[in-house]
C-alpha cells in the first residue's frame, strides 16, 4: 500500500489540499502500479511559527 506523507505550512484551502491528494495519489498509482484504492495520502499542516527557513520562522518571513 503506497503511503505519502506531506508536510505543508498551514493556510492552504480545502480545494488546494484536495488537488494535492488527487495528484499525489495519481502519481503513486502511475509510479507503482498499485490500485488507487490502496493509495493513502496524509497531509500534515504545520503552523507558520513552527516551520523554519534559513534560520527564521515562516511567520517572521511573512509566508
UniProtKB/Swiss-Prot annotation:
Pathway: Aromatic compound metabolism; salicylate degradation. Keywords: Aromatic hydrocarbons catabolism, Isomerase, Plasmid. One of its GO terms (biological process) is salicylic acid catabolic process. GO terms for molecular function: isomerase activity. It comes from the Bacteria. The active site is at residue 2. It catalyses: (2Z,4E)-2-hydroxyhexa-2,4-dienedioate = (3E)-2-oxohex-3-enedioate. It holds the Pfam family Tautomerase. Homohexamer. NCBIfam families: PRK02220.1 (NF002571), taut (TIGR00013). Belongs to the 4-oxalocrotonate tautomerase family. This is 2-hydroxymuconate tautomerase. It comes from Pseudomonas putida (Arthrobacter siderocapsulatus). The gene is tdnL.
Amino acid at each position: 500500500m503506497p503511503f505519502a506523507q506531506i508536510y505543508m505550512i498551514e493556510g492552504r484551502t480545502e480545494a488546494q489540499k484536495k488537488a494535492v491528494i488527487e495528484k499525489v495519489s495519481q502519481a503513486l498509482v502511475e509510479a507503482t502500479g498499485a490500485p488507487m484504492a490502496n493509495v493513502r495520502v496524509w497531509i500534515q499542516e504545520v503552523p507558520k511559527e513552527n516551520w523554519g527557513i534559513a534560520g527564521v520562522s515562516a511567520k517572521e518571513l511573512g509566508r
